[in-house]
Amino acid sequence: MAANPEVFSGRLEGNVAAARRPGSAQEEEGEAAGGALSCVDQGRTIKAEQAGHPTVAMEITSTDFTSTLHLHDAESKELPGDENGLSYTYLSSDKHSHTDSTYFTGISKKGTESPDIKEFSGVGPRSPKEIPTFDSRGLLSSDSGIEMTPAECSEVNKSLADPTEEEKQEAYKYIDISRSPDMKPQQVLDKDFGENKASTIGQAAPTEQQAYDSVTMSWQKDHYNGNISEYLPYVPYMEEPRKDFGLYNSPTSKEPKSAPVTISFTGMETTLQTEYPENQQGKSDKGLKLSPDMVPTVTVSEPEDNSPESITPPSTDADGYTEPSGLEEQRKYKISEDELISAIKAKEGTKGFSSETNEEKQSYSFNVEKQDFTVLPTRDAPAPLDMEGSSTESGDSEIELVSEDQVGAEEAMQSAYMTFSHIGGPPPSPASPSIQYSILREEREAELDSELIIESCDGSSASEESPKRDQDSPMMKPMIMDIIEEENLSRAESFDASDFESCSLKERKLNMENLAESACYLKGTYHTEIRADMPSTKKEELLPQKKSPEGSAYQSKVLGKTSTLPLKPLPFLSKRKAIELLYWRDIKQTGIVFGSVLLMLFSLTQFSVVSVIAYLALAALSATISFRIYKSVLQAVQKTDEGHPFKSYLDMEISLSQEQIQKYTDCLQAYTNSIVKELRRLFLVQDLVDSLKFAVLMWLLTYVGALFNGLTLLIMAVVSMFSLPVVYDKYQAQIDQYLGLVRTNMNTIVTKIQAKIPGTKQKE
């Protein structure tokens, strides 16, 4: 957007004065320049000096040459210096405020002053603290409020904030106007821009590889009616330096060029009242006017700061240009579709913003969080995170209203900022996926480890469900830890971050099985069945084993208890084997067992227990030795080598594991506890009927004892065990019928006895 020099000088009346050097020096330079300054400008300068404003000068500086050209001294000369140097403009004042590290960001106090005549009026004296100064400082960071920085200059200019503005403010605006140093200004298609340059100040010497940025933005408020001055409605933009004239293009020069500008309004649940008052001077005054409650911050910079201390991360394009992002504010930008359409039409027709009168201005709003409007003559914005556009082919200024709801509006701060920048360059890279992946992987590993420890603790309480958890020796536990770490590492490397979220319980169980199989492989043992719902290791296997004061005694105790694999129970102790023996499924095997037991019992009836044990041992040795000699002689005669005749029995595992012993002990303990409780209930007559039944049973056993001794009863029991199941299996129907009759008769007799005994109650 080109600036009209007359209006430009008038706009500076509210915030900047028009002279830095003494009046005599100004007169001399004015005469040397041919009196190019108009009477209107001189009158406004005198008015500004009478109002008590400090004198401010606009200076044009390059990287290797600096010359001061006053705003109201129209000197028709070229800027000397190397053509490769970069010229830039800065404002300076004789009145300097206290130097502070805080940049001028246009922050206004919320509770002290509202944006009224005090803030914007050009009339009345102002204190030095109220006037921002523009001094030459060091390089600026990317989050500076006002900065005017050359691409390669060691000395840059920045505007420091008022010391009173260091306080934390709740409502402020941030406007960032920046341009890439490698961007070339392009031809403006609007012909009205050339007509608006009737009065010019000067023109800077251009170079083809560098661009000249000159942006000045000011708001002046009429102190009589509180309205924005009608001749200050816009933001002037830069013009390309030229060799044939002074600082700005002459009316007879070629069409001006301006670089494309992207205006980004980004907000999240904030509100802004944007007004477009119509300028009474006609459509020749074009620009962007914001609401009067905004105190803007204007930044003209080519920042080179990539420091992480910046408030907002800079975005860097392919050419190395870094654009500082704006400060966030808690405001809501609102505009209606009708106003947006009218702005589009005005832009297409006049390449600028048409203004309305202050009486006709209206407030419109739109929710930036849910809409993404882009006004571009050439291309659309490539991405919502792109603070710069992607088109560098158009010479028109571009306005882009960008929404950030695609990047998680619910989680972000309620903030908004405006950015005026040149389009071009790739979008800033998002957060590194490797960082997110490493964080997710660490969280996932910690979660899996905690679940493994919890499951191991739960599994240790139910010992019968983990028959292999205690066989590991202490030396094998570091190997288990290595297996767990390798398993977690391989799982973390083979899955993405999204796969960690979808990892199911079934996959974790499979990993547990693989871990157990690896442990078994290291020990040289294998097992066929692994329960997936049972942890393969216990808490002691996950954590390093602590040494106790007992030392070797503790180690031997652990060695005696540790076991890894579930062992098959003994053949003669399994329930299935007992059923096969009782039902005579294998007649040979059942006959041997049944005969041996009866022989022992009958021997006990004739001999003592010690004699029976000795004789039985001698008989067993006689049989085995005889068979061993027989097989050896047979192999010698047949000249065969069949090996040991009892090799299959020798290889059979008959050792009892800790789990098996614990299992049988628990079963015996349960039976013992139930018997003790029942005897206590009967002898203490908790139930009289049950106690009487027990008494009758004991009375009948007296007769049985008189007829039979204990061994006889035991022999009868063994015979019954090996005979009754087979008989019942063959004659089940008849036996059930007779047993039913016997049960009925017994119940009838018991009922009659209970009826005759006084004080007894029939048990329901």
Curated annotation (Swiss-Prot):
Keywords: Endoplasmic reticulum, Membrane, Nucleus, Transmembrane, Transmembrane helix. Residues 578-764 form the Reticulon domain. InterPro entries: Reticulon (IPR003388), RTN1-4 (IPR046964). GO terms for cellular component: endoplasmic reticulum membrane; nucleus. Residues 1-37, 115-147, 247-400, 455-475 are annotated as: Disordered. It comes from the Eukaryota. The keyword Membrane applies. Gene3D superfamilies: 1.20.5.2480. Residues 261-282 have a biased composition (Polar residues). Residues 328-337 have a biased composition (Basic and acidic residues). The chain crosses the membrane at residues 607-627, 696-716. It is found in: Endoplasmic reticulum membrane; Nucleus. It is a multi-pass membrane protein. PANTHER family: RETICULON-1 (PTHR45799:SF5), RETICULON-LIKE PROTEIN (PTHR45799). Inhibits amyloid precursor protein processing, probably by blocking BACE1 activity. This is Reticulon-1. It comes from Xenopus tropicalis (Western clawed frog).
